[in-house]
Amino acid sequence: MKNAKQEHFELDQEWVELMVEAKEANISPEEIRKYLLLNKKSAHPGPAARSHTVNPF
């Protein structure tokens, strides 16, 4: 019997395909988790980094 309160989740098909490929490549869920955590980008980016310095003189 299902709960009265059910949640519906829509899966992102691209993520599903990536996870299937990772599984086929024998990449563990823990390895994926670590990769995502290490490469997580902030929702609020800091000041833009300069690729070079500007010398006005």
UniProtKB/Swiss-Prot annotation:
UniProt record, GO biological process: regulation of DNA-templated transcription
Domain Sin per the UniProt entry, residue ranges: 2-40
Domain of life: Bacteria
UniProt xrefs under SUPFAM superfamilies: SinR repressor dimerisation domain-like
GO molecular function: protein dimerization activity
Pfam family, one: SinI
InterPro entries reported in the protein's UniProt record: SinR/SinI_dimer_dom, SinR/SinI_dimer_dom_sf
Function field: Acts as an antagonist to SinR. SinI prevents SinR from binding to its target sequence on the gene for AprE.
Quaternary organization: Heterodimer with SinR.
Protein name according to UniProt: Protein SinI
Species of origin: Bacillus subtilis (strain 168)
Gene of this entry: sinI
